[in-house]
From Swiss-Prot:
Domain of life (superkingdom): Bacteria
Swiss-Prot/TrEMBL keywords: Ribonucleoprotein, Ribosomal protein
Molecular-function GO terms, alphabetical: structural constituent of ribosome
Database matches in HAMAP family: Ribosomal_bL35
InterPro entries for this protein: Ribosomal_bL35, Ribosomal_bL35-like, Ribosomal_bL35_CS, Ribosomal_bL35_sf
Gene this chain is encoded by: rpmI
Residue ranges crossing the lipid bilayer per the database entry: none
Alphabetized NCBIfam families for the sequence: rpmI_bact (TIGR00001)
GO BP field: translation
Keyword Ribosomal protein: yes
Annotated family: Belongs to the bacterial ribosomal protein bL35 family.
Protein name stated in the entry: Large ribosomal subunit protein bL35
Entry keyword annotation includes Nucleus: no
Length: 65
């Protein structure tokens, strides 16, 4: 049986953790940053975890992660 292809867009956006969850970056932190205050930009810098409801979908897109 052939290998399942990894969704390349998902592979660039998500990283698996040791516990089986997935890390992701926050949105709204790439451009138009001058109007956002420092506190908001600092909080957007940190990684977030993908919601449990979305994890099965990510797992299907990245079968070997």
């Amino acid at each position: 049986m052939p290998k399942i292809k990894t969704n390349r867009g998902a592979a660039k956006r998500f990283k698996a953790t040791a516990s089986g969850r997935y890390k992701r970056a926050h949105a709204f932190h790439n451009h138009i940053l001058t109007k956002k205050d420092s506190k908001r930009k600092r909080k957007l810098r940190a990684d977030a975890l993908v919601a449990e409801a979305d994890t099965p979908m990510i797992r299907r897109m990245m079968p070997y992660s």
